[in-house]
Design a protein with these regions (language model features):
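Conserved catalytic segments around the Walker B and adjacent sensor/switch elements
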Residues: 90-107
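Central P-loop NTPase core of STAND/AAA+ ATPases
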Residues: 122-151
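C-terminal alpha-helical "lid" subdomain
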Residues: 2-16, 80, 244-311
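Walker A/P-loop nucleotide-binding motif
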Residues: 63-83
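Conserved NTP-binding/hydrolysis module of P-loop NTPases
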Residues: 107-131
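A short, basic N-terminal segment
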Residues: 1-65, 308-309
Length: 311
């Protein structure tokens, strides 16, 4: 008779216990709540940061200046950025804006920043962007300047989103080139900025901006804004949204967070650092604990004792 090795046995045990627990909770086969780093469905997202969205909307509409959202990893910067990007690129008011997303900046140069910006803007029919660019950085910058004039003529404001500034900040030369390009872009425009910089990064990146490019830092009308942390209410809602997704049901206000009890949710909040990523991870550990408890025939409910004993 074949004897499974220790890890294969563990895989088999976990698979069986999770399947039994998921079936008991009414989950769709193959859907495990809280396991995905990226949200598998936008409906899972908890509505937070309304005040910051209002502020960003104000600065964009009035072309008041540039914005930086600075927070620790896992705080929800990616979701916040995607929320704004989706609205400005596909939403009902998308014809009022152009938006360019600059990613993977760890080895970027000033010229590459310009060309990526132009590549992003080439999709807009109102703008005449050349198919090829000059080799010299200053000449590419002149092309960007010409496009900025077209933006103003078309009464369009371009939002330039730059994510994970900390990746470039590790190398001083790279970061200096990125910041020089961003300041150059941010200064374009006759009656106001043609490009609104929308920067995302960690506190370490923000410190490096202050150190290396104070003139750019001073142009941030909303500097180093942070995102809201999750308390009990937000965590309870997150749990309910994930459970609704796992059951392929529509989330509505008041959707129950069972089998998570209130003491369990408080324990999750206490164990997390309040960021969406940390809260989700603690919710997953609690779910895993619930599956282990159920396998021991100790009940379906996830309590604070469940977490203490099995997580």
């Amino acid at each position: 008779m074949y004897m499974a090795d220790q890890f294969t046995a563990a895989l088999d045990d976990v698979e069986e216990s999770h399947a039994r627990y998921a079936e008991q909770l009414g989950f769709v086969e193959g859907r495990t709540p809280f396991a995905a780093e990226s949200l598998p469905d936008t409906r899972i997202a908890v509505r937070v940061n309304d005040d910051l969205l209002q502020e960003v909307a104000s600065h964009i509409l009035t072309r008041a200046g540039h914005v930086s959202v600075i927070d620790k990893r896992g705080a929800g910067k990616t979701h916040f950025r995607e929320l704004v990007y989706d609205a400005l690129s596909e939403g009902p008011r998308s014809d009022e804006f152009a938006i360019a997303r600059i990613r993977e900046v760890e080895s970027i140069t000033t010229r590459r920043l310009y060309t990526r910006l132009l590549d992003e803007l080439s999709q807009y029919d109102a703008l005449d962007v050349p198919e090829t660019y000059p080799r010299a950085t200053d000449e590419v910058r002149q092309v960007v300047e010409g496009v900025s004039e077209q933006l103003e003529e078309a009464d369009l404001t371009c939002i330039v989103q730059v994510d994970q500034l900390e990746d470039a900040a590790r190398n001083t030369r790279t970061f200096e080139q990125l910041l020089a390009g961003l300041q150059s872009i941010g200064d374009l425009g006759e009656t106001g900025p043609a490009f609104i910089l929308f920067l995302f990064g960690t506190p370490e990146a923000a410190d490096r901006i202050d150190e290396l490019r104070q003139t750019l830092s001073s142009r941030l009308v909303a500097k180093n804004r942070s995102l809201e942390r999750f308390g009990f209410a937000e965590t309870e809602e997150l749990i309910a949204r994930w459970l609704a997704w796992a059951r392929d049901e529509e989330y509505e206000e008041g959707y129950l967070s069972d089998p998570y009890t209130a003491p369990a949710i408080r324990t999750i909040v206490e164990r997390s650092d309040g960021t969406p990523r940390s809260v989700r991870q603690q919710c997953y550990h609690a779910y895993r604990a619930g599956a282990r408890q159920f396998a021991d025939d100790e009940g379906i409910e996830i309590s604070d004792e469940t977490i203490e004993t099995y997580a």
